[in-house]
């Protein structure tokens, strides 16, 4: 997996991985601004990767960023292993560099953002994961810019 400064230009896709849903965000490395894109609402591996392949074909990213889920103290748990596996699969299938990014509290932040604009309860579900992916990607951009 590349370091935080491996890509300096081009489109970047970010993923908030979950067992049932994957949030996707998009951004341009030069602008360093992330936007929510879509949520892949599918728990089966094959349909997930078919949808991801469609996104990659459409957007031609130079880098993929996967949020790495860990406990608040930084220790790993079951989902951490699944996030790493998902990242390896992305890199292997699509031959695009993949960076891992800390995703602690992204869902909490996404929920808060949606509540601020009046989206509550079950209405959040379609947007929550893509907003979390947006936060993952924005944090990646901010940290990679600070490192350069």
Swiss-Prot record:
Subcellular location: Cytoplasm
Keyword Signal listed: no
Keyword terms, alphabetized: Cytoplasm, Hydrolase, Nuclease, Ribosome biogenesis
GO-annotated molecular function: nuclease activity
GO cellular component: cytosol
SMART domains: YqgFc
E.C. number(s) listed in UniProt: 3.1.-.-
Family: Belongs to the YqgF nuclease family.
Full protein name: Putative pre-16S rRNA nuclease
Organism (species): Nitrosomonas europaea (strain ATCC 19718 / CIP 103999 / KCTC 2705 / NBRC 14298)
């Amino acid at each position: 997996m590349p370091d935080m400064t491996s890509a300096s230009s081009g489109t970047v896709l970010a993923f908030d991985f979950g067992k049932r849903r994957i949030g996707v965000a998009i951004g341009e490395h030069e602008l360093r601004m992330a936007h929510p894109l879509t949520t892949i609402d599918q728990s089966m591996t094959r349909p997930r990767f078919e949808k991801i392949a469609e996104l990659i074909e459409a957007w031609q990213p130079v880098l993929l960023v996967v949020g790495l889920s860990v406990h608040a103290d930084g220790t790993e748990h079951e989902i951490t292993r699944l996030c790493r596996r998902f990242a390896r699969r992305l890199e292997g299938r699509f031959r695009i560099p993949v960076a891992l990014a800390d995703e602690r509290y992204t869902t909490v932040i996404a929920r808060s953002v949606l509540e601020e604009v009046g989206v509550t309860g079950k209405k959040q579900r379609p947007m929550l994961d893509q907003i979390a992916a947006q936060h993952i990607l924005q944090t990646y951009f901010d940290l990679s810019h600070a490192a350069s």
